[in-house]
Swiss-Prot record:
GO molecular-function terms, A-Z: 4 iron, 4 sulfur cluster binding; metal ion binding; oxidoreductase activity
Pfam families with a match to the protein in the record: Fer4_11, Fer4_20, Pyr_redox_2
Entry keyword 4Fe-4S: yes
Gene from which the chain derives: aegA
Organism: Escherichia coli (strain K12)
Name recorded for this polypeptide: Putative oxidoreductase AegA
4Fe-4S ferredoxin-type domain sequence ranges: 3-22, 47-77, 78-107, 114-147, 218-252
Entry binding sites for [4Fe-4S] cluster 2: C22, C121, C124, C133
Residues given in the record as [4Fe-4S] cluster 3 binding sites: C56, C59, C64, C97
Length: 659
């Protein structure tokens, strides 16, 4: 009889641990580098309250094997296996499989060419501990069924039938025999999500202190106790771009072991006290949490913040006494999240690092783009002290291409990493968008942060005082919310956020929208700006809008806004802030050294190249927003860490694996 994996739907949590274990088992027990390679051979199905996992049944008279015209699918060692060399990707097996468990996977084999092959459960053939999905299911909902196991199952059921154990009078006895709660019962008994406390609303409206108060110990314990620990490598870990060991450090919080938790946190994350505050967890780890739909996700971000804040306040610092210095030096251009992450990993591998940045403090947009009410700037100052103690050297107020040349860096250092972010505001091409009273989001936020920090403003980034003004912010992302909430704190008489789609389709965090509303912001949805209106002095006085409805989805699956004919109106405004996103700024000093950029100005570098994130100049690596375009802090850090590994491999340094 062929062996197969059987799922117990009554025990299944729907946690996806089996999928992640499957993919890692076929990738040397490592996470794949991108979502494009995430092809589990087992699939979790959720429908209403039903949850189960589906995979190949290894049929005795397998339709996939019978349908294969090239003999690529056959019986091997009590299972049905695919011979990848024989497979021609004809899809006959996909059509023939009655359970829908066959896939065709495309694998790059040469420039512009791919090989299509059939993909199915192989029972982890050759794996010492057997099928990874069975080993890693936290609810024991999966088992490998053999002929012996099947016979034993049938015998057990016959005995239960003979004893009439399914009759009502046996129910109380059965309950007494099962004192240990199953994972499903634990999930059903999970208390509701607990949110962190906030500053009083009046204090929020007039000040720039962080609005979220840190978790108390009892709050952290309560939230940690809600985690089901869905497998060794859980879905929250996979959906985090850094692949943080989330359930493991939550377990350590439950045990009261903050020192071990912070060490584990720093194995994958350079700035956990930052990501705990500014990550959009609702779109990443918390959005994937197994208990999200029933009880609300575990507040992972607040636990992460709690771990770091507690440990750093107690004086925890990274121990690099075991690191052996190597005779290699790397220059990093940009002290933002990508650059700092790259510097961190290189330093932990003994490489000498100098970071160059044009700003007076490290952090890039963490420091100067994100307002203080979301991220206390003292955190970055403390982190600079930590990095400096680790041996990282900083050259601040130093702009590459102006104060120091790339030529000199290439001459002095063994490699260069470029993590400069994106600073050029996207324009909408509206009439009069360069008129007085119209501001780009980033210079507005940078000048505000410098004013709060007591730093000197620059002529090209003057402080904009919105006190008493009627302000309209165009855009629907987190940057737009930052502008809205900043203008309110400076005493604007009225602040409106205008967005061309509906609220459900806003790209920004729901949490940020909620906070903006609480602080007094107004929202105008389904409106598209067509022109900026000027008064007799040439100053902006309003915005001409068209109302919109949602049409067909675009390439990203978001429904396009379609203007409604005859719906034009003018919204009065004393100041307009345009928050449409960012593009990479020009870097002629980089392109002149053979570094290729795409038509949008993004540096061409890939995590899947021979050396991760190596550019077309082999001595120069790049990552973060300069490569992918404006994105999240956590994705920039992930790319900086990957690039550091690429540099280590290219330099021939013996790598110290962090996880």
């Amino acid at each position: 009889m062929n062996r197969f994996i059987m799922a117990n739907s009554q025990q299944c949590l729907g946690c996806h641990a089996c999928e992640i274990a499957c993919v890692m088992a076929h990738n040397d027990e490592q996470h794949v580098l991108s979502q494009h390679h995430f092809h589990p051979r087992i699939t979790v199905i959720k429908h209403q309250q039903q949850r189960s996992a589906v995979t190949c049944h290894h049929c005795e008279d397998a339709p996939c094997a019978r349908s294969c015209p090239n003999g690529a699918i056959s019986h091997v060692d009590d299972s049905i296996q695919v011979n990848q060399q024989k497979c021609i990707g004809c899809k006959s097996c996909v059509v023939a499989c009655p359970f829908g468990t066959m896939q065709i996977v495309l694998t790059p084999v040469a420039a512009g060419k791919v090989k299509a092959t059939a993909h199915k459960c192989d029972l982890c053939a050759g794996r010492e501990n057997g099928p990874a999905c069975v080993e890693n299911c936290p609810a024991d909902a999966l088992q490998l069924v053999t002929d012996v196991a099947l016979s034993g199952m049938a015998k057990s059921r016959r005995l239960r039938t003979a004893r009439q154990e399914h009759q009502p009078w046996h129910a109380s006895t059965a309950a007494q025999e099962m004192p240990v709660m199953s994972k499903v019962e634990q999930m059903q008994a999970t208390p509701a999500r607990g949110e962190p406390d906030k500053l009083a609303i009046e204090a929020r409206k007039t000040g720039f202190d962080e609005i979220y108060l840190p978790f108390r110990a009892d709050q952290a314990q309560r939230e940690a106790s809600r985690c089901l620990k869905c497998g060794e490598h859980s879905v929250c870990e996979w959906t985090c771009p850094l692949h943080n060991h989330i359930p493991q450090w939550i377990e350590l919080v439950k045990a009261g072991n903050i020192d071990a938790a912070v060490e584990l946190s720093h194995q994958t994350n350079t700035l956990p006290e930052i990501t705990g505050r500014v990550c959009p967890q609702d779109r990443l780890c918390e959005g994937a949490c197994t208990i999200r739909d029933e009880h609300g996700a575990v507040t992972i971000g607040n636990i992460e913040r709690y771990i770091s804040d507690q440990a750093l306040a107690k004086g925890w610092r990274p121990d690099l006494s075991h690191v052996t210095k190597v005779d290699k030096r790397v220059a990093i251009i940009g002290a933002g999240p990508a650059g700092l992450a790259c510097a961190d990993v290189l330093t932990r591998n003994g490489v000498g690092v100098t970071v160059y940045d044009r700003h007076p403090e490290i952090g890039g947009l963490l420091t100067f783009g994100i307002p203080s009410f979301k991220l206390d700037k003292s955190l970055l100052a403390r982190r600079r002290e930590i990095f400096s103690a680790m041996g990282i050297h900083f050259e601040l107020n130093c702009e590459v291409g102006k104060d120091v040349s790339l030529d000199s860096l290439l001459e002095q250092y063994d490699a260069v990493f470029v993590g400069v972010g994106t600073y050029r505001s996207m324009k909408a091409g509206l009439p009069n968008e360069d008129a007085p009273g119209v501001y780009d989001a980033l210079p507005f936020l940078i000048a505000n942060t410098k004013q709060v920090m007591g730093l000197e403003e620059l002529p090209e980034e003057p402080f904009i005082n919105t006190a008493g003004l009627n302000v309209v912010v165009l855009g629907g992302g987190d940057t737009a919310m930052d502008c809205v909430r900043t203008a309110l704190r400076h005493g604007a008489s009225n602040v409106t956020c205008a967005y061309r789609r509906d609220e459900a389709n806003m790209p920004g965090s729901k949490k940020e929208v909620k906070n903006a509303r609480e602080e007094g912001a107004n929202f105008e949805f389904n409106v598209q700006p067509v022109a900026l209106e000027l008064n007799e002095q040439g100053h902006v006085c309003g915005i001409r809008f068209l109302r919109t409805r949602l049409g067909e989805p675009d390439a990203q699956g978001r429904r396009r806004p379609v203007p409604v004919e005859g719906s034009e109106f003018v919204m009065p405004a004393d100041a307009v802030i345009m928050a449409f996103g960012f593009n990479p700024h020009g870097m002629p000093w980089l392109e002149s050294h053979g570094v290729t950029v795409d038509k949008w100005g993004r540096i061409i570098a890939d995590v899947e190249s021979q050396y991760r994130y190596q550019t077309t100049n082999p001595k120069i690596f790049a990552g973060g927003d300069a490569v992918r375009g404006a994105d999240l802090v956590v994705t920039a850090m992930a790319e900086g860490r990957h690039a550091a590994q690429g540099i280590i491999d290219w330099l021939g340094v013996k790598s110290v694996k962090s996880h």
